[in-house]
Amino acid sequence: MPAAKHLAKSHSRVGAVVADVWSQLPVRDGSVHAIMDVFAPRNPAEFARVLAPGGEVVALIAHQGHLDELRDPLGILGVEAGKLERMVEQAKGHLELASEPQLIEYTMRLERDAIAAQVGMSPSARHVAPDVLQERLAALPEHMDVTARGQLVRLRKA
């Protein structure tokens, strides 16, 4: 994972782990001061186990409107309503909100290859046949303006 390697080299006190969140994370109990979760699954019980006192989870959760410009031409999944509320409910007993969620929204100008990579990392990669997706990607313009939209949430141990 190039991003994790880059992060780990950014400072002597920074570490990065890429792991299956549904397995035990390869770190000691109470040893992590910050967990960053970007458009990825969350395991509140496991996050709470590894968080140090005062530690936080910073999560970016896709919000309705995220990548909407790609939905029709590629046939990819939309973001379901109530995603943040479900995450907060699932975290009960493990994590609680540390601050009010913030809406983050901006437009990105993406090349077709970047769009393919973005879709390949998303749940849509498992819902559209690879050959169909490649055909649809080829029909896109070389560059597109695409909206990124998510909610930034800070959580701490309950």
Placement of each model-derived feature along the sequence:
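Short alpha-helix immediately C-terminal to the canonical SAM-binding loop
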Residues: 1-5, 44, 67
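Class I SAM-dependent methyltransferase SAM/SAH-binding core
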Residues: 1-24
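A short acidic, Gly/Pro-enriched loop at the edge of an enzyme's catalytic core
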Residues: 22-35
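Short catalytic micro-motifs in class I SAM-dependent methyltransferases
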Residues: 34, 39-42
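A short glycine-rich, Lys/Arg-flanked "PGG" loop and its adjoining helix->strand segment in the class I
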Residues: 42-58
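Conserved class I S-adenosyl-L-methionine
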Residues: 56-89
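Active-site capping/gating segments
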Residues: 79-114
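Conserved Class I S-adenosyl-L-methionine
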Residues: 102-158
